[in-house]
Amino acid sequence: MSELNALLKDINGSLTATSESLERLSGIYSNSATDEIPESNQLHEHLFYDAKKPAEKVSLLSLKNGSMLGYINSLLMLIGNRLDDECKDPSAMDARERSIQHRVVLERGVKPLEKKLAYQLDKLTRAYVKMEKEYKDAEKRALEKSTLVNHSGNDDSEDDESSEDEIAYRPNTSGIINTNKKSSAYRVEETAKQENGEENDDNETGVYKPPKITAVLPPQQTHFEDRFDAREHKDRSNKSRMQAMEEYIRESSDQPDWSASIGADIVNHGRGGIKSLRDTEKERRVTSFEEDNFTRLNITNKAEKRKQKQRERNARMNVIGGEDFGIFSSKRKLEDSTSRRGAKKTRSAWDRAQRRL
């Protein structure tokens, strides 16, 4: 209640001050008919001529001030309507709608514009303050310089008169400086012509020729030696090994192994099984190709969809109780993957037919 009373007192004080200023203006305007007062004439011209001119543009500051004053006026009318139940003024009845309208203008119109223009306004104000400061500093330096010149002028006047006769017979130093400058510039031009003879020829013909750049190999990393050899992970027939052999080689090798995060290799929320290492490598190659070439590979054709569905069906068959038993589903024999004979071509037709089974 104390805050509300203080707020009402402030509102009453502002209203009394506004009423006093309006009474003063009305007194000045009423006396303008009898007495010729320049202030009253200016007020009369502003009210009847300047204020009635159509405004071509509305500034942000005027819109903000007008909306704020209209919002405060609507709130006061709404408060008065609440306090006085017998009030029949139609403007007081529409105070709620006008207060909502002004509030929307302030929040949706003025505030976003202020945020957009805040950087430019701050930049302009900083530039103005900086310019004003530099102007004041320049004035201060000029004043100090003028005072120093005035003090030193009286002391040096006698020395200047005595040295005028000596300076009258001095050599022409400006000519020496100009010749030195010309000679140095000439030497620089000659050296440039000798070094860049081809460029001078190009300038004379008017045709641009790019400079010749010697081919240089890219920098090679000598501090780290990558011992990974992709040929060790393939058979001589260029076909993939059995899954059991792949896992055995991967676990027994000393090479650093790359693995996805936990759960990243689960396909189709667990219904598609677990993504194999071959599929992961393929996706990684596709991703690196897309990132290097800035393009998308369209691999969602019918054949790929058919293969994907087949892989999902096989994965559902191989996963039992959450464990992948796909290492036992390969039709190839272990002897064919480990022995040298398996990499060679079979000798008889019966062996080749048996190999296809």
Swiss-Prot record:
Present with 1430 molecules/cell in log phase SD medium. Keywords: Acetylation, Nucleus, Ribonucleoprotein, Ribosome biogenesis, rRNA processing. Its main location: nucleus. The gene is LCP5. Pfam families: Sas10_Utp3 (PF04000). Component of the U3 small nucleolar ribonucleoprotein. Required for the early cleavages at sites A0, A1 and A2 of the pre-ribosomal RNA. Participates in ribosome biogenesis. GO terms for biological process: endonucleolytic cleavage in 5'-ETS of tricistronic rRNA transcript (SSU-rRNA, 5.8S rRNA, LSU-rRNA); endonucleolytic cleavage in ITS1 to separate SSU-rRNA from 5.8S rRNA and LSU-rRNA from tricistronic rRNA transcript (SSU-rRNA, 5.8S rRNA, LSU-rRNA); maturation of SSU-rRNA; maturation of SSU-rRNA from tricistronic rRNA transcript (SSU-rRNA, 5.8S rRNA, LSU-rRNA). InterPro entries: Sas10/Utp3/C1D (IPR007146). Residues 171-183 have a biased composition (Polar residues). It is found in: Nucleus, Nucleolus. Residues 146-211, 301-357 are annotated as: Disordered. Residues 155-166 have a biased composition (Acidic residues). One of its GO terms (cellular component) is sno(s)RNA-containing ribonucleoprotein complex. This is U3 small nucleolar ribonucleoprotein protein LCP5. The keyword Acetylation applies. It comes from the Eukaryota. It comes from Saccharomyces cerevisiae (strain ATCC 204508 / S288c). The modification N-acetylserine is found at residue 2. Residues 187-196, 348-357 have a biased composition (Basic and acidic residues).
